[in-house]
Amino acid sequence: MVKFTPSFNRLVGEFAKLPGIGRKTAVRLTLFMLRQTSQDALALGEAVRELKERTRFCSRCFYFTEEDPCPLCTDVGRDDQLICVVEEPQDVIAIERSRSFRGRYHVLHGSLSPLDGIGPDDLKIDALLERLQQNNVKEVLLATNFDVEGEATALYLAKVIQPFGVKVTRLAHGIPTGSDLEYVDEATVNHAVEGRREL
């Protein structure tokens, strides 16, 4: 078995914590960093530090931002009466790429998953309900993923939103079951937004 230095192993371990990065890729990334100049390697560390210091979640929609509220929440060209609920920030990016949605967003930061111990209190559902109480929202578009957890989350949200008298719609099924929005092409997301249906 190949032996690595402690500092090499430490960086491999840190890279391996990233989503989609296994040990082999972590080793390749670490070898790449070894070939970089000290200045380039330090620039990466500085970029990570700056991200952690400056970026936070918007207090309204929970998308990431450097200013609070975020530009998506302060954009006067967006429809305040329409809120799109997504699981993760990357889902906002996928929908924005499609250029088919001009309302507001609400990021839950997860989906209901009782087997993993994730219930309604672990998501940004209460904040969504507060927004519905305080604002003149006419429609909530549920854009959770089309997997078991995403469907369960959408059904739960439809139930708790119902007393507000707000129209609740769901993305059309142009998006394959079991897929994550971030991996779907723009045209498919656009079709799904345009073909949303009421729940």
From Swiss-Prot:
The Toprim domain extends over 81-176
**Which GO annotations describe the biological process of this protein?**
DNA recombination; DNA repair
Q: One MF term from GO for this chain?
A: zinc ion binding
> Which SUPFAM superfamilies did the record assign?
Recombination protein RecR (SSF111304)
One short Pfam family name for this protein?
RecR_C
UniProt keyword annotations, A-Z:
DNA damage, DNA recombination, DNA repair, Metal-binding, Zinc, Zinc-finger
In this entry, which stretches build a coiled coil? none
Q: Where are the zinc fingers (C4-type)?
A: 58-73
- State whether keyword Metal-binding applies: yes
The protein's role, per its UniProt record: May play a role in DNA repair. It seems to be involved in an RecBC-independent recombinational process of DNA repair. It may act with RecF and RecO.
Which PANTHER family does its entry note? RECOMBINATION PROTEIN RECR
Q: Which family does it belong to?
A: Belongs to the RecR family.
Q: This chain belongs to which protein, by name? A: Recombination protein RecR
Record organism: Syntrophotalea carbinolica (strain DSM 2380 / NBRC 103641 / GraBd1) (Pelobacter carbinolicus)
Classification from the root reads: Bacteria, Pseudomonadati, Thermodesulfobacteriota, Desulfuromonadia, Desulfuromonadales
Q: State the gene name recorded for this protein.
A: recR
